């Protein structure tokens, strides 16, 4: 029993380090803003001009950009946006998704602002500041509420 108690801390540390190593994503690496595709840099400077790029992570097939105002933008390898997520209670700017989405929100949701938007195969998944999730097709036509 004494031998077991003697080796227990070492065993515990070994297991914890193994779990930590498995949890780390070796594919993500920090890169400079200059290494982003041109279309991603243009997107950030056009729609988020007042924020600075805080950190850029590169994976094999995508980029994740963290802005100084807390907004996170995911881009594919070509630099096209995939997901734009603002901090809680912060509204995203308009203009980078179909105008029909804004038209629907003005008419049916009292103009509620968008907190997160992502591109999906069917179109767009939108989370409003009110917490309501909506789905739109690729043209911006409302499909349904998302549970």
What are these regions (language model features)?
Residues 18-23:
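C-terminal motif of bacterial Sec signal peptides marking the signal peptidase cleavage site
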């Amino acid at each position: 029993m004494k031998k077991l108690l003697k080796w227990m801390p070492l065993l515990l540390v070994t297991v914890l380090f193994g779990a930590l190593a498995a949890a780390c994503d070796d594919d993500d690496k920090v890169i400079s803003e200059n290494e982003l595709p041109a279309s991603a840099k243009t997107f950030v400077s056009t729609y988020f001009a007042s924020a600075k790029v805080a950190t850029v992570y590169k994976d094999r097939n995508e980029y994740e950009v963290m802005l100084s105002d807390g907004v996170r933008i995911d881009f594919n390898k070509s630099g096209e946006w995939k997901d734009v997520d603002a901090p809680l209670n912060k509204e995203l700017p308009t203009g980078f998704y179909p105008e029909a989405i804004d038209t629907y929100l003005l008419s049916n949701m009292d103009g509620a602002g968008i907190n997160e938007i992502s591109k999906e195969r069917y179109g767009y998944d939108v989370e409003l500041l009110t917490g309501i999730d909506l789905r739109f097709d690729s043209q911006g036509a409302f499909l349904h509420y998302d549970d």
